[in-house]
A protein has these predicted regions:
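A glycine-rich, hydrophobic loop/mini-helix early in the fold
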Residues: 235
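Alpha-helical bundle regulatory/interaction domains
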Residues: 1-162, 166-171, 181-186, 200-222, ...
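DNA major-groove recognition helix of helix-turn-helix
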Residues: 178, 190, 230-231, 243
């Protein structure tokens, strides 16, 4: 994170939570509003002293602007995993903020436990501990959707049209199960996954002539023009404007850890 965005720290989840969580994280908000890019994940967040919310998977960019000094702490769930922890289909959370109290009866007690901690990292650690306590109540994820997510993550040029045969479901049935688990249909998820792959590759790619064209192909786009259209559609920025600042995005997720 850049200093003007605030101090931001991610911590890998403890072993029993690794299949469900990308990380727990905490941030003290800085002076600059922040672009949060779609990543297919859902978060449970405690923002300042407010009641916690579930932030559903996003279909586009969000501009987050909070008072400087606000403490945010939360847990980021892997694509397709939060539905196992909630009695609600993920597509009912997409592009929404849902009060956690609407979904967990003990949300108030959980909040008292977390907000008793004064520092961002202590709140983050309290969230991890609370989820560890709750883990036995989580249902298993949909195994066929998990297989589809894993295949898309491993195949930069994988075709969504091939998924039904690969997982043994009809197209309509797979689409519905995918929406329930992930929050949107496989094609949209593949687009977001490709964007996140591009961001991850851009962090390591050397500067030089032909960089954008090479990144486009490595990330799974048909060509540089395809990459430009998709970046603009999903983030509001062309690749040349987006990629230099990729490391300052909140939602840089390692999709390739598909436990």
């Amino acid at each position: 994170m850049s200093a003007s965005s605030g101090d931001y720290r991610e911590v890998a989840p403890p072993g029993p939570l690794a299949a469900s969580l990308v990380c727990t994280w905490a941030q003290t908000v800085g002076a600059r509003a922040q672009r949060v890019l779609p990543d297919g994940c859902a978060d449970i967040l405690w923002i300042g002293e407010d009641a916690p919310v579930v932030v559903g998977p996003a279909t586009g960019v969000t501009l987050a602007a909070l008072p400087p000094g606000t403490i945010i702490a939360g847990a980021r769930f892997r694509p397709g995993r939060i539905a196992a922890w909630l009695s609600l289909a993920t597509d009912e959370l997409t592009d929404r903020l849902t009060p956690l109290a609407d979904l967990w009866r003990d949300a108030d007690a959980l909040t008292a436990r977390i907000l008793a901690e004064a520092t961002p990292d202590a709140r983050r650690a309290a969230i991890a501990a609370a989820l560890l306590d709750r883990a036995p109540q989580a249902r298993p994820p949909d195994p066929l959707v998990a297989a589809a997510i894993g295949w898309l993550a491993r195949q930069p040029r994988g075709r969504v049209a091939d998924l039904p045969a690969l997982v043994g479901l009809g197209e309509r049935q797979l689409r519905r199960r995918f929406q329930v688990a992930v929050g949107y249909e496989p094609k949209r998820f593949a687009r977001i996954l490709r964007l996140q792959r591009l961001l991850a590759l851009a962090e390591r790619a050397p500067a030089g002539r032909g960089r954008l064209a090479a990144l486009a192909l490595a990330a799974g786009y048909a060509d540089q023009a395809h990459m430009a259209r998709e970046c603009t559609a999903l983030t509001g920025l062309a690749p040349g404007a987006l990629l230099p600042g990729a490391a300052s995005a909140l939602a840089l997720t390692d999709f390739f850890k598909t436990a």
